[in-house]
Amino acid sequence: MGKISKHRLACIVFAIIMGIFGIFHLFNASSMVNVVPKWLPGGILWVYVTGVGFILAAIAILINVQTKLACYLLAVMLLIFIGTIHVPAMMGGDPISRQLAMLMMLKDVGLVMAAFLVGYNSDKPDEE
């Protein structure tokens, strides 16, 4: 069995985390629906759609097929979360809710950057 590169290991860990997010969305949709913007029709449907999006991105990264496209689409989805969920939540509510929204936004900014890095480097050969 060959040695796995640090880059590939990082991609696998990132994919597993995205897959877990997707599973959480599918199995906890009823508790996550509260963060879907009220002006967006469909409610719980969007929780399921994003869950499937996370899982499909994870699969693409794991099997290394269409990884660049999957990661860039994942980054766009996370940027949409920032603009439609986290930023509005930081503008209103009690101080603890605003602080939580800030933390979630920072987490998603980090995930966006990771998705861009994984996608950007997906077609480069692994080096040790």
Question: Where are the language model's segments positioned?
Answer:
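Short juxtamembrane and helix-loop transition motifs at transmembrane-helix boundaries
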Residues: 9-10, 28-41
